[in-house]
A protein has these predicted regions:
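Short catalytic/ligand-binding loop motif for oxyanion handling, primarily in non-cytosolic enzymes
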Residues: 10-13, 114, 132-134
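Active-site-proximal substrate-binding core of FAD-dependent oxidoreductases
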Residues: 149-163
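Conserved structured core elements
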Residues: 54-57, 84, 103-108, 116, ...
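Hydrophobic, Leu/Ile/Phe/Ala-enriched alpha-helical segments that form helix-helix packing faces
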Residues: 90-97, 154
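Short FAD-binding loop at a beta-strand-to-alpha-helix junction that anchors the flavin cofactor
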Residues: 63, 117-135
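Flavin (FAD/FMN) cofactor-binding core of flavoprotein oxidoreductases
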Residues: 97-124
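Predominantly flavin-linked oxidoreductase catalytic cores and closely associated redox partners
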Residues: 1-93, 147
């Protein structure tokens, strides 16, 4: 048994004939994101235990508050918005003075998932199994969905008993 943890490359999963990658592209219109680190305005700015998702003309913005900064990004459709336009909109939203480093991380992705998670002796895990959008909640759901069949298999019971 092999776990394919090779991310977007899906090295092991793609080697198996009949890889049924399902992309709901007609329902999910974003396929790119620009992300950066944002400074808090001041010490009183809220640090809360959830991610904000904010609608934007180009798509949507996520804001993940952590101890000393905010992780944020703008999801957009690259077929109608350039990387530069996305960066400009992101800076306009936050203000140039809030950017922590001035550096941007561009992420291009194809939303989708494996129609069947366990094929032959390969189980794709994490980004190898699918990617819907850059929020951890969907990634965690895909991870749990991939690992659930493994948790109940006889091989895992045998391994657990011998530990």
């Amino acid at each position: 048994m092999f776990l394919d943890c090779t991310g977007f490359k899906k090295v092991l999963s793609n080697a198996i004939p009949g890889n049924d990658w399902t992309t709901p592209g007609d329902m999910l219109f974003v396929n790119s994101a620009v992300a950066s680190q944002i400074n808090y305005k001041d010490d009183n700015e809220s640090q809360h235990p959830y991610v904000d998702a904010v609608a934007h003309d180009l798509g949507w913005i996520w804001k993940t508050p952590i101890k000393d900064r905010i992780g944020s990004g703008l999801c957009y459709n690259s077929s109608i918005t350039s990387k530069q336009d996305a960066e400009d909109a992101f800076v306009e939203y936050w203000g140039k003075d809030r950017l922590r480093t001035g550096e941007f991380n561009h992420i291009d992705f194809t939303p989708g998932y494996n129609a069947k998670n366990w094929r032959a002796n390969v189980i794709p895990v994490g980004l190898s199994s699918g990617f819907v959008e850059p929020l951890e909640s969907s990634g965690l759901a895909l991870m749990i969905n991939c690992m659930a069949p493994l948790a109940g298999c006889k091989l895992m019971e045998s391994i657990h008993q011998n530990i």
